């Protein structure tokens, strides 16, 4: 299955973005993870069908209520994100960060 990795830039922390992303991904039968980054962005990696990933990307550009998405960056090499879980998880720390 195709895999995609994104960084979402804007007001995306403290507004329920990770929970919303998880619900959206599960509804689309995607697996992967989402986490807050120390720089204030949200990072995620998902795999599934091309159609489901395209729907997720469209949703990410809008975001949930109370968020403001300024930009979505699609990363070229999501394979370096490592193995994905069997479902879609919220991760609480970026590798090497001391806080959420």
Curated annotation (Swiss-Prot):
Protein keywords? Hydrolase
Catalytic residues identified in the record: 18, 36
Q: What class of enzyme is it?
A: hydrolase
Tell me which PANTHER family the record gives.
Answer: ACYLPHOSPHATASE
Q: Where is this region: Disordered?
A: 76-100
Ranges for the Acylphosphatase-like domain?
3-92
Q: Where is the signal peptide?
A: none
Q: Which reactions does this protein catalyse?
A: an acyl phosphate + H2O = a carboxylate + phosphate + H(+)
Report the superkingdom from the record.
Bacteria
One of the entry's Gene Ontology molecular-function terms is: acylphosphatase activity
Q: What is this protein called?
A: Acylphosphatase
Cite the EC number. Answer: 3.6.1.7
User: Which family does this protein fall into?
Assistant: Belongs to the acylphosphatase family.
Q: Which gene encodes it?
A: acyP
Q: Does the keyword Hydrolase apply?
A: yes
* Pfam families registered for this protein in UniProt: Acylphosphatase (PF00708)
């Amino acid at each position: 299955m195709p895999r995609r990795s994104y960084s979402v830039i804007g007001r995306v922390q403290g507004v329920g973005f990770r929970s919303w992303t998880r619900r959206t991904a599960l509804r689309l039968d995607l697996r992967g993870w989402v986490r807050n980054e120390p720089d204030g962005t949200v990072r995620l990696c998902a795999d599934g069908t091309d159609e489901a990933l395209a729907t997720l990307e469209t949703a990410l550009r809008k975001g949930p209520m109370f968020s403001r998405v300024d930009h979505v960056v699609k990363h070229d090499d999501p394979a370096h994100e490592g193995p994905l879980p069997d479902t879609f998880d919220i991760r609480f720390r970026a590798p090497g960060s001391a806080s959420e």
